[in-house]
Amino acid sequence: YDVSRWVHTRDIVIDETEIPHSHPVLTLHARHLKDDDLLLSTFVHEQTHRMLDEHPTEHAAAVRALRKLYPRIPVGYPEGSDSAEVNYDHLIIIYIEYRADQRLMGELRARAVMEFLSHDHYRWLYRELLREPEKVGRVVKASGL
């Protein structure tokens, strides 16, 4: 796969004991070792965290707009992350992840990945993106991300 457009760091660690995260070093797990699509989607997801760091003004504008669209966003596992702020970030990230997956693996496989993740973690966030992707997409595009 040509993932160059979604690479924002080349410093990557693979650690089978860690939950994937983007900072301080982008770290991926081996949980989905037998599913290339899930591995690829996780890679794009974590790289997108780094992309938001590179565009703080656009990122802040998108979060402000999402707060208006989703004033009562779920907080806490498994529906979301540990804060509303991080959930707004994740709506952006998951939208970009879904669009990247569509380009890299096609709509059917991308949808299957999102469906799986909507039953795994950040459940509400992934379900919301599947339900109405363009609602978040309009915000992402309008903010310049």
For each feature predicted by the language model, list its residue ranges.
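Short, hydrophobic/amphipathic alpha-helical patches that form generic packing surfaces
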Residues: N87-Q102
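Pan-zinc metallopeptidase signature
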Residues: Q102, G106-L145
